[in-house]
């Protein structure tokens, strides 16, 4: 499920897209693929995109892959900034959750992205209403790019994350920074 896309041979920004998924009153939503606010496979930024996933205390949302606010894919180049992911209620994300991911080439950024995950509080402290099957990142740079992952934020309550949590995660080569992340 995708809010906006710039294809591989195009140039331009993917911005201001919103994906909203809501399960009401004993309902269940199952999505067999990924959910993203905006994906840029060309030349340009992915910014100000949002994903909102919510459910009531008697319903759930299950995503079989990952959830992210904005992405510059490996075939693209540009910055990923100010994307938001909000997940509340109950359900399971089988893979990772990220506010912004930059896999593009050249010098880039993945900054000021926000992830909020808030599950229902259970009487049993070992039971979580939201399960994340992998990790949670505010913003990340992956692959061979250099750049900044700055001022990203992650907030998680009443939820279980299987792997790790990071505000900013920078795997770029060359001159990189990761600062002021929460």
For every predicted segment, state its role.
Residues 1-34, 39-66, 71-96, 101-164, ...:
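Surface-exposed loop/turn motifs in large extracellular/passenger domains
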């Amino acid at each position: 499920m995708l809010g906006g896309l710039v294809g591989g041979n195009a140039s331009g920004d993917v911005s201001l897209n919103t994906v909203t998924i809501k399960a009401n009153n004993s309902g269940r939503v199952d999505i067999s693929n990924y959910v993203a606010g905006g994906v840029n496979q060309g030349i340009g930024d992915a910014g100000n995109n949002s994903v909102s996933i919510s459910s009531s205390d008697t319903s759930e949302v299950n995503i079989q892959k990952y959830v992210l606010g904005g992405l510059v894919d490996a075939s693209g180049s540009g910055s990923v900034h100010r994307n938001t992911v909000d997940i509340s209620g109950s359900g399971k994300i089988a893979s990772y959750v990220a506010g912004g991911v930059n896999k593009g080439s050249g010098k880039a950024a993945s900054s000021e992205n926000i992830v909020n995950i808030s599950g229902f509080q259970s009487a049993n402290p070992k039971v979580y209403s939201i399960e994340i099957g992998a990790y949670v990142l505010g913003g990340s740079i992956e692959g061979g790019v250099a750049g900044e992952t700055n001022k990203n934020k992650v907030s998680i309550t009443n939820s279980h994350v299987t792997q790790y949590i990071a505000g900013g995660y920078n795997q770029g080569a060359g001159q990189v920074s990761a600062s002021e992340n929460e």
